[in-house]
Amino acid sequence: MQSAESGLLILPPNLMQRRVLKIKRILSYSRDTKVSHKVVLAYFRKHYWLIANGFCPYCHNHYRTFGILANHIMRSHTLEVAEDYFKLREKIKERGRK
């Protein structure tokens, strides 16, 4: 489904939930700590258009399925994901202090 006015892909809730869970797996890959759901949602919002349309948010290559995209991100962009994760986590912590 696509929004007529914005041209953005709008995902049905069940598909969105599965993608959010896979993003949680991507963010927790290579870390032993539990990943905060707030960080997962912030990451998804930050890269929504690219992820929803099958593009890697780091190298902008297009992938046919979300599963292939998720595997690509985990294997090829571990450092970038970790950097994003810690930046988003710090932002969320700072908002909580204010």
Swiss-Prot record:
It comes from the Viruses. InterPro entries: Znf_C2H2_type (IPR013087). Keywords: Metal-binding, Zinc, Zinc-finger. A zinc finger (C2H2-type) spans 54-77. GO terms for molecular function: zinc ion binding. This is Putative zinc finger protein ORF98b. It comes from Acidianus two-tailed virus (ATV). The lineage of its organism: Viruses, Viruses incertae sedis, Bicaudaviridae, Bicaudavirus.
